Structure formats: C-alpha cells, structure tokens
Amino acid sequence: MAIVNHTLGFPRVGLRRELKKAQESYWAGNATQEELLTVGRELRARHWQQQKDAGVDLLPVGDFAWYDHVLTTSLLLGNVPARHQNEDGSVDLDTLFRIGRGRAPTGQPAAAAEMTKWFNTNYHYMVPEFTKGQQFKLTWTQLLDEVDEALALGHKVKPVLLGPVTYLWLGKVKGEQFDRLSLLQDILPVYQQVLAELTKRGIEWVQIDEPALALELSQEWLAAFKPAYDALQGQVKLLLTTYFDSVSQNLETIKALPVQGLHIDLVHGKDDAATLSAQLPANWVLSLGVINGRNVWRADLSNWFERLQPLVGTRDLWLGSSCSLLHSPIDLSVEVRLDDEVKSWFAFAIQKCAELSLLSQALNSGNGQALEAYSAPIRARRTSTRVNNVAVAQRLAAITAQDSQRQNVYSVRADAQRERFNLPAWPTTTIGSFPQTTEIRGLRLDFKQGRLDGNNYRTGIAEHIKQAVAEQERLGLDVLVHGEAERNDMVEYFGEHLDGFVFTQNGWVQSYGSRCVKPPVIIGDVSRPEAITVEWAKYAQSLTDKPMKGMLTGPVTILCWSFPREDVTRETIAKQIALALRDEVADLEAAGIGIIQIDEPALREGLPLHRSDWDAYLAWAVDAFRLNAAVAKDDTQIHTHMCYCEFNDIMDSIAALDADVITIETSRSDMELLESFEEFEYPNEIGPGVYDIHSPNVPSVEWMEALLKKAAQRIPAERLWVNPDCGLKTRGWPETRQALANMVQAAQRLRETQ
C-alpha cells in the first residue's frame, strides 16, 4: 500500500501571466483564437511536466480554465444564459467569454454573469444561473479534450470535475422562483455521460470536487448527495474531494456514499486524520491534504511525518495539497530580490509539489531524516528578529477594553461633528480613489525603477492631487478626497509602509478571468515605523476649505488580502495592524484631518465557512476596527466603506463597528441592501452608493434622485449621504466628471424639495 501523492489543481495563468496576456490580446482583436488556444496548450503541457518533474504521481487534468472552472462546468452542462446564446445553440470559446465579460452574440452589451468569491478565498467564480424547466446536455468537451492531450503526452492523470451538488449550491435561480435542487436529476445524465467517456479512455480515478461538504449544510442539501452519487457510481473510481474546512459535521452523509475515496483538508480543517480514518469504510482511499494550497509558507514536513506515520499501513493513503494550488504563486526560484532568509521560509506551487514528493517518499520508506534539513528554516524562523518584535508584543498585551471605545456614543459625536463641519443635507462625497491615468501609473513606475528621483516624484504626485481637488471643487462636492494618485493598490501601499510585510516580483495569483493580484506576505509582527498617509492628506487639505477625508485600508481587509502568517492567529495579526493604523488615525487628526475613512470591504469575506464559528470571528474583526478607530476625538468623523456585501445576517456586527458613517454598494441591487439597515434600525449615518462605478455608463440625474428617494423611505434623510458605489480608480475622467456632476445635481434637487 504505497502512498500516492497528487495535487488537486495547479495555477493556470503561467509564470509570466501568459494566459492573461493572451486573453486580453484576443479580446482586443490583436490575436487569433488559434494563437490563444496555442498558449493554453503550451501552458498545460508545461504545468503537467513541472508537476511530474517535481515528483507528483497523479496529475490533475481539468483544472485549467479559460476564465473560471465553475463557468467551464456551466458550459460542460450546456448551461448558457439566453442572453449569451448563439442562435444555433452551439457553444464555443466566445460563448464562454461573453458570459464572463458581458456581451451578446451580436457584440452588444449584455449583463455578465454575477461574480462572487469562491468560498472564503480571494478567487472569484461566475455564478451559474438556473431557470425553471431548464434543459442540460453535454455541449463543451474541454475536459475530455484536455484528458486526451495529457494522455498523448504519456502522463498518468486524474481528471477533475466539479461535483453536481456543489455546482447547484453555487448557482442562483433567475426568473420564476423554484428549488434549484430539483435540477439535480436533469444534470446527472450529463455527468454520467462524461464519466462514461473517461472510462473509455482508460481513466482509473476521477477527482470529483464537493467543497460544499465543508459547510454546515441543511438536511435538504445533505439529502441530495446519496441519490446523486448512486447515479454516478459504477464507472470510474471517484475520489470525493473536500477542502477549505473540516467535514466531520457531514461525516454520516459522506460515509453512505458509493465512492472509492475521500480527500480532506488537514490544513484548514479541524479533523483528526486517525479518528476520521477509523470511521470510514476500510476499502476507501483516504487522501490527506497536508500541503497548504492557499499560502506561500514552506511546510514543516518533519511535523507532518510524525503526525502521519502511525496511519501508514492501516489503509490506502494518498497525500495531496489541501486544495488546488490555484491560490498559490507558481515558482519561488524566480524571486531573485527576496533575501535568502525570507526566501527559505517560502514554497510556491512547484515547491509544494516537491514537498508532496519528499513527504510521500519519507513515509513510504519509514525514514524521515531527510525532512529534518528541509524543515529547519521554518523552525529557525520562530526565533528570527524579522518575525518577533518585543515592542509589538508588549503593546498587544497592554490592550484594554477601553482602547476600543470612542469617547462618547454616536448621538453625542454627531452633534460635535455637525457643529464642526456644518455640512448641508444630503452631503456629497466620493469613496476615495480617482482615475489612475497612464500618466499617474507612469510616474509611479519611473520612481519605482529609479528613473525619477524622490523630489520630482513628489512634485508630480502633488500636481495630480491638486488637479483632483480642483475637479471636486468645480463639481461642488461637499467632502473631498485627495484621489490616491500615490497608491498602486489599497493593500500593497500600506504593506510597503509597515514593518512585517514583504513583496514578491512574480507572486501572481488569479482573482478572476484575466485579473491577477500579487498579495503581500505578512512575515512577522506588524508595526508602523513612520506616518504613511499624513503628508498627502495634509497637503490636499491645504488646497481647500472643505473637509478632506483621510483614507486608510482597514486591518481586516489588509489581513484578508495578504498571505498571512501561519504561526499566530488571524486575530493577533489583525490587532497588530489595527494598532499600527491607530497611530495613523491619531497623526491624521493631529494634522487637522477631521474626517477619516477606514475601508473594510473584506469584513464579510473573512467569515469562516462554518456558521457556528462566525461569532468568534466577528467579535475580533469588529474589535480590530474599533481598536483602529477609537483613538479619534468626538468631532472627528470616522467613515467606513464596504462593497459586494450582504448585510442582513451580520447587521449586529456592522452596527458594532460604531463608524459614524458607512458607505455601501447598493446601486446594482436597486437599494435592496438598505432593507437590512431599515429592519435593524441602524442608528448611524449611511451613504448608499447611487451609481455603479464598475460600468462606464453615466447615470442620469433623475435615476440617482429616484434611488435616493427610495433610500429615504428606509433611512431618515438627515442620516443619508450621497456617493458612488466604490472608488473611481478604474474609470476615465470624462465619465467620472459627468457622473459626479449628475450626482451633485441630484443631491441639490433633493435639498430644494425638503
């Protein structure tokens, strides 16, 4: 019973983001479809070979996607929204891109599929749409074609298929409401057909992903698994694959399924491998996800060897990544700017494959000696001065409950703020960023690469800030922002100015479609060596008599959008960041900045998958925000901004943030999100976004006025602000000017009618 190792998936984009560049070139009409397809074939061949060379026994096929793997599954099943369908019902690569990007077959705009986070990761998937009486059929053979490719190259492969129950769980009903689980019987024949085709190709194992089993599912959803897998049994062997959390809460359901193996995530789950193994059918393969697919840290293989050795020989064991390596950068070896000490702490996708090979070899031989040397750097890290900062630890230990409390309650603060700012009814503002022009990006790049000295860089940034302030004054906005010309990214910018962070050159991971992000890595205790935003906020305030907002990214968002440490809790990291940013709030206040916005768009994203764990997370997440903000005096107005949020199930926590003003994304939901605030009787001020900044469309004055009137039916007008949905970084100036002018006019009309 030799241990087999495998990965659940591999990054798609390529070391140099080749897929992104090929996609965007094709979309722009600068490359043919065949050229795009060639890039895909080359990437798949390279990635299979890289995994094989690193010692992976069983290679995943079907993890590659032209846009998103859930969207690929939709096409496999023939699930194409009517607005994106070809007249003849055919499905091709352009169909896939139309769904992801928002086009009709005629080339006219048509709403893209909704996009949302893949469980609790920073990857986004395209939400499947379901309609009553919908038909499904095998229309997109990408998986089968890629299996043929891999077999032709001589690889031993394991096709990857998103499971039917999770697929339905991920989707949304459109039009007439019905139970989407009723579609299960309609999609199973397509799954049967795919498995039959794989059987014909001599495939032994199929990895069938059901990450929904890591959730606390209702009985209705749990009951769907048995009939689904009864229908799928009897062809190839099925490895039921779960990840992102433990599955013990659903173990009775899992044990009854006619599958041949189970994969569990031992990195993020709380399951004990030996306990779980004893409860599973003896003839099942148990695949243990021991290498973290969602982070960049080198594994302590010696520790895993000690934990897993008692299981060897008790049953068929596989070793795998905790989840797909999609969420990890590709290759550490190209990171030439990281110093040797820090680099020795990391492992990217290729290195993680090698870790699987090392660990499986050691367990198969019964000799873990080779793992000691490999694990030494991660163990030495524990005492590194790069990691441990005594002053941070002392400050963290000294936190009291009072540190998270503003001086007075909101009603008292609101009076002080009204007296200080004397704002009109329906005050207008923006969320923070203004268009990042080619000139601004070029200025930052020239400075970063040494072609521009510091003085000339600051002169250039100051000019862009001056222009942004002048634009806002011309438009008649009430509370201004400096526009963030100096910031490349809302998390990276702060990470670059805080101790405890490092940055990679090529640590790209896919966010969605062709969009890639390069998250910072939190390697040690976080502190602020000097003020970060004060210089530019103070300069911007000097240009106007109107209030100027200071702009900070909040502690939970910085944590969620970085690769975090694994040796301390997320709560500890969040509170370290909060203390650093607390000092920034105090310095902004001392510099005369009276309104400070602390953005927390990731607050909801950080929720654990198990609802039973929510309260503990929300308690420390809210406390981190309050710790960050509570140093402010009564007449300093604290704003926060959240986007892509559903609030109704966390309203207590939103209110507990105790921000004076919260701005939220509501235009796309036609103000429906405000229902949560109305029902809860949210006590503080709210700025419901009145137009969607993700679209170049310019909303009319009448449209925004109507939305604001709708908002005033739910929230008292004296507590309403007027603002866009989100920052304007990705927009151009022409539509920004026009949209904001209309927004200001809508607010003025409402003032006149009050």
Swiss-Prot record:
Cofactor binding: number and manner: Binds 1 zinc ion per subunit.
The prosthetic group or cofactor this protein requires is: Zn(2+)
The protein depicted here goes by the name 5-methyltetrahydropteroyltriglutamate--homocysteine methyltransferase
Q: What is the taxonomic lineage of the source species?
A: Bacteria, Pseudomonadati, Pseudomonadota, Gammaproteobacteria, Enterobacterales
Question: Which GO-annotated molecular functions does the record name?
Answer: 5-methyltetrahydropteroyltriglutamate-homocysteine S-methyltransferase activity; zinc ion binding
As recorded in UniProt, coiled-coil segments are: none
Keyword RNA-binding listed? The answer is: no
One GO-annotated biological process of the protein: methionine biosynthetic process
| Source superkingdom | Bacteria
Question: Where along this sequence does the record place binding of Zn(2+)?
Answer: 641, 643, 665, 726
User: What family is this protein classified in?
Assistant: Belongs to the vitamin-B12 independent methionine synthase family.
Origin organism is Pectobacterium atrosepticum (strain SCRI 1043 / ATCC BAA-672)
Listed under catalytic activity are: 5-methyltetrahydropteroyltri-L-glutamate + L-homocysteine = tetrahydropteroyltri-L-glutamate + L-methionine
Q: Where does 5-methyltetrahydropteroyltri-L-glutamate bind?
A: 17-20, 117, 515-516, 561, 605
